[in-house]
């Protein structure tokens, strides 16, 4: 369920704003989206894993707050990010 260091590095390189960026809101949202995707797959196979379901809801809330922050800062960057990640219909 957790991300490997190599996969995190791929996400950092794909979404970073500058070469040493690992903590911007865009990168954090991308990492959270990957974790949410993996956890959703786990929960489809393990329907009674309620602890993981709680963790999933926590991750979704965190991503929602970060996306609200990005929207408040720069609407164009927000639209580009959600389109690139394939979230929000």
Swiss-Prot record:
InterPro entries: Ribosomal_uS15 (IPR000589), Ribosomal_uS15_bac-type (IPR005290), uS15_NS1_RNA-bd_sf (IPR009068). CDD domains: Ribosomal_S15p_S13e. It holds the Pfam family Ribosomal_S15. Keywords: Ribonucleoprotein, Ribosomal protein, RNA-binding, rRNA-binding. GO terms for cellular component: cytosolic small ribosomal subunit. The keyword Ribonucleoprotein applies. Gene3D superfamilies: 6.10.250.3130, S15/NS1, RNA-binding. PROSITE patterns: RIBOSOMAL_S15. The keyword Iron does not apply. One of its GO terms (molecular function) is structural constituent of ribosome. One of the primary rRNA binding proteins, it binds directly to 16S rRNA where it helps nucleate assembly of the platform of the 30S subunit by binding and bridging several RNA helices of the 16S rRNA. Forms an intersubunit bridge (bridge B4) with the 23S rRNA of the 50S subunit in the ribosome. NCBIfam families: S15_bact (TIGR00952). Part of the 30S ribosomal subunit. Forms a bridge to the 50S subunit in the 70S ribosome, contacting the 23S rRNA. This is Small ribosomal subunit protein uS15. The lineage of its organism: Bacteria, Bacillati, Cyanobacteriota, Cyanophyceae, Synechococcales.
